[in-house]
């Protein structure tokens, strides 16, 4: 059962099976009132909903880093381009709240778009040059939208730590850069990529895949694993990329990009630089059917 508390937020209650349900706040006022009642360190997991086992792993990591866990569920219109999947992005609020309850989340913020953006925002966070390459070049303005909503959520939730998945590596790098550049008092925790049994990185968009699409999509983690084997054997980035491209071409997927980069700056690492450093991140984006997927894997030269 969920009861209404002060300010209209649905307060924390216990279901018939003994599971404690989180407070659900739908307005900024409700969020602030519920947040004020939390004492001790707060860990925050921002999401767009359609929660899956990858999100579950984030919630469990958050629990280790705070006395309280706060989750936001908000499909942010600012980070979608005009031809992207905002309208069809999966929305599964009941299931999302059930997962939050099962994982002991204390507070869930579920604002409508009009609550976050009552008018067209005139001031936004710019992702700068880092936000213009790779994902940013394919999705112009995407990272400005991501950083704007994350900055707003940090301001509203006031977390001590926030947990982001490594699957969205460029987003993680940009959030870290924003926190450093704007002196935001939030520690960013990077969570390992959660992989499904067939190796595909968990993603809300995986549910778009048909069985045939999924069989093709498995080439993405295979390509990255192949590149990692090249790195471990002493091969340079050019060979890693060549071998990854071959795996993806054999699977007949559409390749947006594959590159070996520095995980903090997303500068590409060439063969000469690799010989000095011996580590980096192989990133790739593909399209299968009507679905776009991204993934990455660390590359390390054998000792």
UniProtKB/Swiss-Prot annotation:
Question: Which residues of the sequence carry a binding annotation for (R)-pantoate?
Answer: 79, 171
Q: Where is this region: Disordered?
A: 1-21
Q: Name one Pfam family in it.
A: Pantoate_ligase
Query: Which reactions is this enzyme annotated as catalysing?
Result: (R)-pantoate + beta-alanine + ATP = (R)-pantothenate + AMP + diphosphate + H(+)
InterPro entries, A to Z: Cyt_trans-like, Pantoate_ligase, Pantoate_ligase_C, Rossmann-like_a/b/a_fold
Q: Could you say which residues bind beta-alanine here?
A: 79
The Swiss-Prot or TrEMBL record describes its family as follows: Belongs to the pantothenate synthetase family.
Q: What does this protein do?
A: Catalyzes the condensation of pantoate with beta-alanine in an ATP-dependent reaction via a pantoyl-adenylate intermediate.
What name goes with this protein? Answer: Pantothenate synthetase
